[in-house]
Amino acid sequence: MELLNSAENVLDILCLWDSDKEQALGLNEISKLTGINKSTVHKILQSLKKRNLVQQNEANKKYSLGVGILRLSTCVLKNLDLREIAHPLLKQLAYMCQNTVTLGIRSENNFIFIDRIDGRDNVRFYCDIGKVTPFYGGAAAKALFSHLNDKDINKILQSMEEKKFTEKTKGRTALIEEIKLIRKNGFSLSDEEVDIGVLAIGAPIFDYRGDAIAGVAVAGIKQTFTPEILEINKKLLLEYTHIISKKMGYSGNIRK
């Protein structure tokens, strides 16, 4: 029991710091906030300092999280499996929207689909798992591409070979013009650009570094996407991609 109490004391102290409270705390403050006596707090802090889990400012003697925490958190984040985390949420999204939902990631200079949940319309279109497409090939791809850093975007654009899926397919030039709009709105649209009769809306997923790592799209038969349905699907898509991003360690805010 004594060992358990000691472990709980350590956790209580470490949990005083979170992403919303990046502050330094003094010995008295920590003791008051946790209800642990100062002598015990001091011993715990000294032990945590040895392992670089906390650091102390020599000027004001206050404590904050150390680089050891960063190493531990990085190990956790590296083991996060995007598809495993996203799949149950994408199933919920598909159920809520009653449309097909797809998930894809970057594969060198292209986009590859890694998950798909069919909607009630069971429409067949160019987004099977394992399918590789250029970054102008659909809403999910464009959503991810537009949120890459400018250096990567320029690199991909230079190697991009244009392919027409339909008469409405947008090539390199149109994609460049669309990037700013997608970044501003937080979502992308694909209006029969890959499959005739199919409309899709896409949004990115971010990781703990704030980097775009994936794109999600809600797609269905264009005739069923009334302005009202499109707005509902957009809100649901942004909500669910934000939830997935948070689970991947992202700390930014959701787009409205």
What residue ranges belong to the model's regions?
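N-terminal helix-turn-helix
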Residues: 1-79
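Short, structured helix-loop boundary elements
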Residues: 3-7, 27, 62, 66, ...
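Amphipathic alpha-helical regulatory segments at dimerization interfaces
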Residues: 16, 33, 85-96, 185, ...
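Hydrophobic packing within well-folded, soluble alpha/beta domains
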Residues: 30, 41-44, 48, 54, ...
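Amphipathic alpha-helical effector-binding/dimerization core
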Residues: 61-159
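Cysteine/selenocysteine-centered motifs that mediate thiol-based redox chemistry or coordinate metal-sulfur cofactors
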Residues: 155-156, 238-256
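Extended hydrophobic
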Residues: 168-240
